[in-house]
Amino acid sequence: MAVIFYLSGTGNSLYAAKSIAQELEQCRLEGITGYLKAPYEVQDEVVGIVCPVYCMALPPVVEAFLQQVKMVPQYIFLVVTMGAMSGQALGQGKELLKQRELRLSYGAQVALPDNSIVFPSPQARQEKLLRNAPAELGLIARNIKNKYDNYQHLDRGFLWKYGGTAAGMWVLDKIKQFGKLSCADDKCVGCGICAEVCPAGNITMAAGKPAE
């Protein structure tokens, strides 16, 4: 049996997780935030984590998951989705698991359209990424199915580790300058889907609109 724990904000990582799961036999999907709310001992022999890259690193909630998840699988894989660069994300995942005497057997990255406000991708590039994604995810899934091991190649070295951290801090500083997130009242129909699907539970509804 196999399980893929995923975190997805815009849908890229959920799409990747579903694509990989379809290629594996008897594989189920579980949300990382759901697991953290109700943790249990994972019995599956194959455990995967699929998540986006945030500021060239793993999202804090994924970091917390890797520090807390109860598991002793035979094979662990980590797949990250990104707009341009994965930074230190794979090496970070490897190190977090190593600290718990667990081994990240396989790590991979796949480029998909990003939602960066600071560095938005041109439309032509986004369309190209979407065309290439099925083949890239298919290869990743086959590698996982065949228990491919690239443990020795997951470290990015000094430049990626500390350069990624510096770049991430710079991006976060730019994001803070955009101010508070608000809803476009003339376009919002009050469906509540944003509150339902937000993986971190950061959106609440008030009077039929997302509360600010």
Predicted feature descriptions by range:
Residues 2-4, 8-173:
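FMN-binding flavodoxin-like domain, especially the glycine-rich phosphate-binding loop
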Residues 90, 190-191:
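Generic non-transmembrane alpha-helix signal with a bias for helix starts/N-cap capping motifs
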Residues 168-190, 196-197, 201-212:
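Ferredoxin-like iron-sulfur electron-transfer modules
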Residues 1-2, 198:
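A broadly tuned "polar low-complexity/structure-edge" signature
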Residues 136-139, 193, 197:
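Non-catalytic alpha-helical scaffold/packing segments enriched in small hydrophobic residues
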